[in-house]
């Protein structure tokens, strides 16, 4: 098992990674001061049916424990479910000393975290991720819900008390979710750990390799990349934006295709390829785009759909949180491990995106 210490200006906490990590949950709760009054577990239907009772049983503590379960899917990260969770919290008499446990993937972590951030102006919560993708979202304190006009547009910064990454929970994931989460692993390697990038190319030949000791190795290497960036910039005023590598186009694809019709990781994978494609032009460097494209396709990442309107995607990219005064800002790569936020004119993005779309076919 590997423990990772997270340090930010507002809070310090640990990420417990391994096959026995759930055994830490009771101790974490018992050691909290002031003492936890009661516990609300927020999960989704798919995860709850598999793991909710396991977590309840692991909480060997004399406190009221109740659950709030929403349907599965990114579209459920909505104001309606956010409001309903608050109603459930009030009906079950949560107070300022209560604890919320986020049991699920990134959608649940974001929703539950935002409920914790806003209920009575902020109560404590613990992340219990059940997907590979959540190795990114569970760490760093960004919590949010979606708006019909944009992803993660309503939210806060609210750090968890701990992250309990019990790797056996991941074994029930379908392949598309392994692929989705692996995209964020690749992102962390490309922007912050070149040695990990080369290790992935050598040691992860198929998604089936993302198991057991290799999985723990990946998590204990990828999470510190994010931790180091968050330690420098907790509230995304500077270098934390580097973690959005691949996300400008990725989020636009999610919005255009409809949440649930493309996974977050698949969108980010296409977005990273485009960022590398554009970076070669902007920086006049060779980043081995063709080799990278073949590597991504080997894992089953999608190509950019040929029937999507480039103009529509450009307009959606202008709604990205990094955009400033209607100008697209993208995270581009100077070299492996070195990225920057760059202002890109609409016309440049449009021309590059058209060329990229054609190159995919």
From Swiss-Prot:
GO molecular function: 3-dehydroquinate synthase activity; metal ion binding; nucleotide binding
Residues involved in NAD(+) binding: 72-77, 130-131, 142, 151
Catalytic activity: 7-phospho-2-dehydro-3-deoxy-D-arabino-heptonate = 3-dehydroquinate + phosphate
Any single Gene Ontology cellular-component annotation: cytoplasm
Residues that, per the record, bind Zn(2+): 184, 247, 264
Function per UniProt: Catalyzes the conversion of 3-deoxy-D-arabino-heptulosonate 7-phosphate (DAHP) to dehydroquinate (DHQ).
Involved pathway(s): Metabolic intermediate biosynthesis; chorismate biosynthesis; chorismate from D-erythrose 4-phosphate and phosphoenolpyruvate: step 2/7
EC numbers: 4.2.3.4
GO biological process, one term: aromatic amino acid family biosynthetic process
Name the record gives this protein: 3-dehydroquinate synthase
Keyword Lyase: yes
């Amino acid at each position: 098992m590997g423990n990772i210490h997270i340090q930010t200006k507002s809070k310090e906490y640990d990420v417990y990674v391994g096959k026995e990590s759930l055994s830490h949950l009771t101790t974490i709760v018992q050691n909290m001061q002031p003492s936890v009054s009661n516990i609300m577990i927020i999960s989704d239907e798919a995860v709850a049916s598999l793991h909710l009772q396991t977590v309840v049983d692991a909480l060997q503590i004399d406190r009221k424990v109740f659950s709030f379960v929403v349907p599965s899917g990114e579209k459920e990260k909505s104001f309606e479910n956010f409001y309903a969770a608050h109603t459930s919290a009030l009906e079950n008499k949560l107070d300022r000393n209560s604890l919320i446990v986020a049991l699920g993937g990134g959608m649940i972590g974001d929703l539950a975290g935002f409920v914790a951030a806003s209920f009575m102006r902020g109560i404590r919560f613990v992340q219990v991720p059940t997907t590979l993708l959540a190795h990114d979202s569970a760490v760093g304190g960004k919590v949010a819900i979606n708006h019909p006009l944009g992803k993660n547009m309503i939210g806060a910064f609210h750090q968890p008390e701990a992250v309990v990454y019990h790797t056996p929970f991941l074994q029930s994931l379908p392949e598309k979710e392994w692929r989705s989460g692996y995209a964020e692993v690749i992102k962390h390697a490309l922007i912050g750990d070149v040695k990990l990038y080369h290790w992935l190319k050598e040691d992860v030949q198929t998604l089936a390799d993302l198991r057991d000791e290799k999985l723990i190795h990946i998590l204990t290497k990828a999470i510190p990349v994010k931790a180091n960036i968050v330690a420098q910039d907790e509230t995304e005023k500077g270098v934390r934006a580097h973690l959005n590598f691949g996300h400008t186009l990725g989020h636009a694809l999610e919005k255009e295709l409809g949440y649930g019709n493309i996974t977050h990781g698949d969108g980010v994978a296409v977005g990273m390829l485009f960022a590398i494609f554009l970076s070669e032009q902007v920086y006049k460097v060779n980043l081995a785009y063709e080799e990278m494209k073949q590597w991504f396709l080997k894992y089953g990442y999608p190509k950019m759909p040929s029937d999507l309107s480039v103009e529509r995607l450009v307009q959606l990219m202008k709604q990205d949180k990094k955009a400033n005064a209607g100008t697209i800002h993208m995270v581009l790569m100077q070299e492996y491990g070195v990225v920057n936020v760059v202002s890109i004119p609409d016309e440049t993005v449009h021309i590059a995106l058209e060329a990229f779309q054609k190159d995919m076919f």
